[in-house]
Amino acid sequence: MNNKKSKDPIQKYPIPPFPKQPQDVPGITSKMNPLPDHGEQSYVGRGLLKDAVCIITGGDSGIGKAVAIAMAREGAKIVISYKDKVEDEDAKDTLDWIEKAGSEGILIRGDIRNEKQCLKIVEKTISKYGRIDILVNNAAYQMTYNSIEEIDTIEWDKTFDTNIRAMF
């Protein structure tokens, strides 16, 4: 049993309002204020996914990074798919946390809106690990607008190609 005293979850994390985050999309974790909590210091695994092979799209940051760290601490091998060179720092940091968990992983950069990129992710995973056990379709894209009428066709296509089409 864990004898650590629990902290009130309402006071455990930063409370809004947060400062403006002047970043282009995709954002970089190290430039966020406050820094997000991906479970780096808190999640304790129990080996529930020992030797499972997991692909996580968008696994370099945000929810994808938290999932990657948790699955690695559960014993899984992690394949992180992420989109742009600008995300290399976040992806490398996530891989470092995977390795600190005693697991291993690979990074695959490329846009999953491109079907050939999706095939490349599968091929590299099979080549390295021989199988795929878990797929986490986490990568997503969305911009906010005051009205749906403001969304042009290019924006609509980018959103659906990332969030829906890439999964198939």
Where are these regions (language model features)?
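Non-catalytic terminal and boundary segments that flank Rossmann-like NAD(P)-dependent oxidoreductase
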Residues: 1-50
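Helix N-cap/beta-alpha junction loops of NAD(P)-dependent oxidoreductase domains
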Residues: 41, 142-147
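Canonical Rossmann dinucleotide-binding motif of NAD(H)/NADP(H)-dependent dehydrogenases/reductases
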Residues: 46-80
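Conserved Rossmann-like nucleotide-binding pocket used by diverse enzymes
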Residues: 55, 79, 106-108, 135, ...
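Conserved glycine-rich Rossmann-like NAD(P)H-binding loop of the short-chain dehydrogenase/reductase
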Residues: 76-93
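The beta1-alpha1 cofactor-binding region of Rossmann-like NAD(H)/NADP(H)-dependent oxidoreductases
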Residues: 88, 108-121, 153
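A glycine-rich helix->loop->beta "capping" turn
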Residues: 101-104, 124-137, 143-144, 155
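Catalytic Tyr-X3-Lys loop
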Residues: 133, 141, 149-168
